[in-house]
């Protein structure tokens, strides 16, 4: 017997970065110094660390950073789509990754989830952030071994994942944005004088 197999056409949207909608800096009132620092970081491709009390807007500003990065090129879109496809994160509703990725893993994330893993190696958070932003909120809360995972990709722009099934190297060229409180209670240096942390606690 014979079976006739036909291609099933699928509508692929045009690779047009102009159609991408980002959160906008114009939504944020004030914070001009922070906006300026983020503009400089975005223009130069620099990593950035924000330190401030709770409610200062660190997360809000970070989520708007992709909106001031350059539009993705066709090659960047295809590479990011390839990564997301391998991770099983593409589908009918999002066949093409045309927006700068913004990944914000929780501080309880494991090293394998950050770098990539599985019986068959799959991309982790740092590769899913390729061509975009990796945001680490509450930086001191991340485990040391998880932060160590960032060393190779920050230096080489890629990460190598070794498992029994084989070794894979995934792209991992991202802008690292970190945020943290200045002390355990979060209020050190605030004009309200609410901080009750000791000098040793602040240094820790």
Predicted regions and their residues:
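Pre-Walker A segment
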Residues: 9-37
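Acidic, proline/serine/threonine- and glycine-rich low-complexity intrinsically disordered segments
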Residues: 7-8, 179
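Conserved ASCE/P-loop NTPase catalytic core
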Residues: 26-204
């Amino acid at each position: 017997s014979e079976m006739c197999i036909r291609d099933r056409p699928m509508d692929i949207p045009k690779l047009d970065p102009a159609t991408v909608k980002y959160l906008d800096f114009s939504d944020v009132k004030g914070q001009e110094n922070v906006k300026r620092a983020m503009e400089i970081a975005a223009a130069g491709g620099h990593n950035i660390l924000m330190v401030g009390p709770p409610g200062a807007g660190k997360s809000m500003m970070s989520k708007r950073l992709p909106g001031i990065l350059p539009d993705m090129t066709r090659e960047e879109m295809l590479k990011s789509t390839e990564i997301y496809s391998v991770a099983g994160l593409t589908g009918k509703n999002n066949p093409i990754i045309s927006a700068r990725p913004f990944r914000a893993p929780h501080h309880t994330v494991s090293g394998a989830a950050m770098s990539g893993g599985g019986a068959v190696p799959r991309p982790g958070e740092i590769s899913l952030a390729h061509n975009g932003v990796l945001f680490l909120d509450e930086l001191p809360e991340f485990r040391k071994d998880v932060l160590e995972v960032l060393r190779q990709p920050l230096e080489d722009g890629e990460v190598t994942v070794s498992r029994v099934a084989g070794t894979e190297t995934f792209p991992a060229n991202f802008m690292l944005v970190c945020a943290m409180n200045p002390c355990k209670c979060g209020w050190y240096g605030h004009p309200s004088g609410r901080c009750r942390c000791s000098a040793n606690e602040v240094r820790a």
